[in-house]
Regions:
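N-terminal leader/targeting pre-sequences
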Residues: 1-143
Length: 143
């Protein structure tokens, strides 16, 4: 479940294991129209009102931020997602760098991880520049 800073449910992220990596399906509503940074953060904790408790982008491999930079991207770098004029996000994102558990970049490691939607778009450069965190969801096993 994705929640905003008021604790309201604004969407969900579902993760499916693929032959190589994962498929990430994100749906959300109540998001300002436009492009938004979407990242996997290093700690499965959305308790802080600004979601800083989720830590930095997930980078277990030590790579730098930015799809368009050298020695990058790190595992938590994901493509921007778009909210339409009604504030709805519906996106499928793939990552060959991430795994659910095991291998080099497991989302379900000891301290977990969290998906974050940011207020603005990621620059894909050395600094994300995506602004404040507006929605957060801890990665959990499906029940």
């Amino acid at each position: 479940t994705l929640a905003n800073s008021d604790g309201q449910n604004v969407g969900e992220v579902k993760v499916f294991e693929a032959a190589e990596g994962v498929l990430i399906r994100v749906t959300a509503e109540g998001i300002d129209e436009g492009w938004h940074g979407f990242h996997l953060h290093e700690t499965g904790d959305c308790s802080a009102v600004d979601f800083s408790s989720a830590g930095s982008h997930y980078a277990p491999d030590g790579k730098a931020h930015g799809t368009l930079t050298d020695n990058a991207p790190h595992a938590g770098d994901l493509p921007n997602v778009h909210a339409d004029a009604e504030g709805k996000v519906a996106a499928d994102v793939t990552s060959v760098a991430l795994t659910v558990d095991g291998d080099a970049a497991p989302m379900m490691d000891d301290d977990g991880s969290a998906f974050i939607i940011h207020q603005g778009p990621d620059s894909y450069g050395e600094e994300a520049g995506a602004g404040p965190r507006i929605a957060c969801g801890v990665v959990e096993a499906a029940s």
